[in-house]
């Protein structure tokens, strides 16, 4: 059974606290947009699609409570203002992830349309928002499954070496159920390959400095019993050079894809794309349409978030000196020289020229004969 990282029903939202994974599987209840903001900022939830869904549902949960307590304004305009301010606040929690601003923009439009309805009320406006947020949750899961199917088919038809009939795939960061509403994008492709018995083996990078690969992707792969091996980030080149291993494709997710295909994703993605090009390995980006930003023309226009130095100079994990029956004890350990300067960008930009295909819920987009992506075609009816 695929891991469920976001639980939502009847206006009640709970998420797995990813800061405690893989050691403790604990759900945290999110009641308000403020709690949602902190969960995103503190990376208790991460992954561009999941961030957008949690932000929307956090506000939906807050509105549900206000309605139940009769504390919501009956005035449609006042409720619209309340929702809009909360959405802008939520977007500030993770500016690089385009899914968050995209979802907020769509929800603002729905709210604005609701206000225009004859005899609109605050309750009606809030209800329109809640229904739209819940619909986003369901659509994200369905989109992820389509991404998985299209990606698995493309790899089987275009990436397999002549020596193997099943695919070996390397992935980076975490792009599974923990990063989306469910199933995953890049990890969803691996899941789809596994479900059709066309996966030979999966490899995942540890993804320094926050270790999303070792903490989260490895956790999901073990949970789903998918044959997989963890490597450190610096081992990727050696892995691709081993002919007997035969990595067929590298599949990653995205936090923002510019109109020309340039992709912002977890730091280290760019390096993997360069390695893939040198070794003749297919490099694929798996992303829903909500991650594609046609307004941003190239990666040069994407704002790169910088994270605290402590994420590089410390590491957090469990103590191994306790007995199996004892409660899990988490500790933070310093691993760098005190006083050293730190540069910690959360993302890098992979040029579209290094990407072989962008997997979406509408299919896999490849470059034309001039080496250009035409992502705008995806949005035409």
Curated annotation (Swiss-Prot):
Q: Give the UniProt subcellular location, in the record's own words.
A: Cytoplasm; Nucleus
Q: Name one GO biological process term.
A: L-methionine salvage from methylthioadenosine
Q: Which InterPro entries match?
A: IF-2B-related, IF-M1Pi, IF_2B-like_C, Initiation_fac_2B_a/b/d, M1Pi_N, NagB/RpiA_transferase-like
- Pfam families in the record: IF-2B
List its EC numbers.
5.3.1.23
Per the record, the pathway is:
Amino-acid biosynthesis; L-methionine biosynthesis via salvage pathway; L-methionine from S-methyl-5-thio-alpha-D-ribose 1-phosphate: step 1/6
Query: What enzyme category does the UniProt record give?
Result: isomerase
Any one GO cellular component localisation term in the record? cytoplasm
Q: Which reaction does it catalyse?
A: 5-(methylsulfanyl)-alpha-D-ribose 1-phosphate = 5-(methylsulfanyl)-D-ribulose 1-phosphate
Q: Which Gene3D superfamilies match?
A: translation initiation factor eif-2b, domain 1, Translation initiation factor eif-2b, domain 2
Per the record, the major location class is cytoplasm
Task: Tell me the GO molecular function terms.
Answer: S-methyl-5-thioribose-1-phosphate isomerase activity
Q: Which SUPFAM superfamilies match?
A: NagB/RpiA/CoA transferase-like (SSF100950)
The active site of this protein is located at: 255
UniProt keywords (A-Z) are: Amino-acid biosynthesis, Cytoplasm, Isomerase, Methionine biosynthesis, Nucleus
Locate the site labelled Transition state stabilizer.
173
- Reported function: Catalyzes the interconversion of methylthioribose-1-phosphate (MTR-1-P) into methylthioribulose-1-phosphate (MTRu-1-P).
Q: Which HAMAP family match?
A: Salvage_MtnA
What does the similarity note say? Belongs to the eIF-2B alpha/beta/delta subunits family. MtnA subfamily.
The entry's protein name is: Methylthioribose-1-phosphate isomerase
Organism, per UniProt? Aspergillus oryzae (strain ATCC 42149 / RIB 40) (Yellow koji mold)
Which gene codes for it? mri1
